Amino acid sequence: MTKIKDLMTADLQYCTVLDNVYEAAVKMKDANVGAIPVVDEDGETLVGIVTDRDLVLRGIAIKKPNSQKITDAMTEKPVSVEEDASVDEVLHLMASHQLRRIPVTKNKKLTGIVTLGDLSLSEQTNERAGSALSDISEGDNREEGFFH
């Protein structure tokens, strides 16, 4: 059975709780991603995730300065999975929480991120990823709330 650690992106950008929203936005731009995990000061323990949507709704749209702490814009305690999680478990979490990406951890330490795109690239998971995307998109008409 395929494990998420076999499909996740392990070489990823992340922010620490010491970063600000400007630094997060630059890292997202440079990596061409729409979300970036946030780790504790130790640089390893996952504590949050910030999306481009979070930066807009919790920062720019309410006229917060670029020096705003990343912790003020991030989603704390994000849904995450351990490296040995199954594809089915991840797809279920994505569909039930309307997520397109989920941080991957090992003993609470950030080791990667898995996206619907990662799952759609695998022949074994492509069809199931499409089904999860359909479930996510059906619930995507929310007016408020912050999701990653």
Swiss-Prot record:
UniProt biased composition (Basic and acidic residues): 139-148
Keywords: CBS domain, Repeat
Lineage per the UniProt record: Bacteria, Bacillati, Bacillota, Bacilli, Bacillales
Annotated ranges, domain CBS: 8-68, 74-130
Pfam families, sorted: CBS (PF00571)
InterPro entries: CBS_dom, CBS_dom_sf, Diverse_CBS-Domain
Segments of this protein annotated with the region Disordered: 127-148
Domain of life, per lineage: Bacteria
Name of the molecule in the record: Uncharacterized protein YlbB
Signal peptide positions on this chain: none
